[in-house]
Amino acid sequence: MQERIAKVLACAILGPIVMLSAVRPARAQDPSTPYPNMAPLDQYLMTDVNSEISLARSAAPSSSSEGAEVMVLGRSGYTTAAQGRNGFLCLVERSWGAATHDRDFWNATVRSPVCFNPAAARTYVPVYLMKTRLVLAGRSKIEIVQAIEAALDKKDLPALEPGAMAYMTSKQQYLSDEAKQWHPHLMFFVPGDAAKSWGADLPGSPVMAANDPEEGLTIFLVWVGNWSDGSPAPPTAH
């Protein structure tokens, strides 16, 4: 998912954050992308289920992730590999969590562990799971965007609940070739283009925003000082 906000990442690691244009609509399409097409599916899969479970749980502190449901990616999509008891859901996003025009959309190296709280698990994750099924079915980028848009319009996908948020604090994350590990952060999901109402991206504001027209929401990011294992994150400022 962090790959979906690649423009946020690029701005953050290069200097002061400027107003971004995307969570999925991150960067403009780069015709020289090294990933013009989907790689063989095996390159996106993790061969050891336990390793994927562990990586998924590393997205959040164990106080939340140990009781979370965990989903892992297989040839037909994500399936539950560990039952949960606290309503949280952890998984490792792949590159197609990005905007369809993002240069890393087919980057098979991307591994983005995310732990969603109950509200996000119920109402945000279904969009990503649908997108995954479309990818694995061989749908084109245009078809993916159209299918998601139609499902949202027809309310085949749930409306985003208030309070939906997620942890991305895994030291093992690889978010894109540009951002790589980046920085531990929290994400908050809000319907529509809501950046101004949160005071995001203003001078001195700790809140970054990425508008996502493909899914009709804004993702707000707030850096935190430690990785999920408690170790300090590198000092960075925006």
Task: Kindly label every feature range from the protein language model.
Residues Q29-H238:
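Primary mode marks residue(s) on the alpha4-beta5-alpha5 output face of response regulator receiver
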Residues A10-S21:
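Bacterial N-terminal signal peptides
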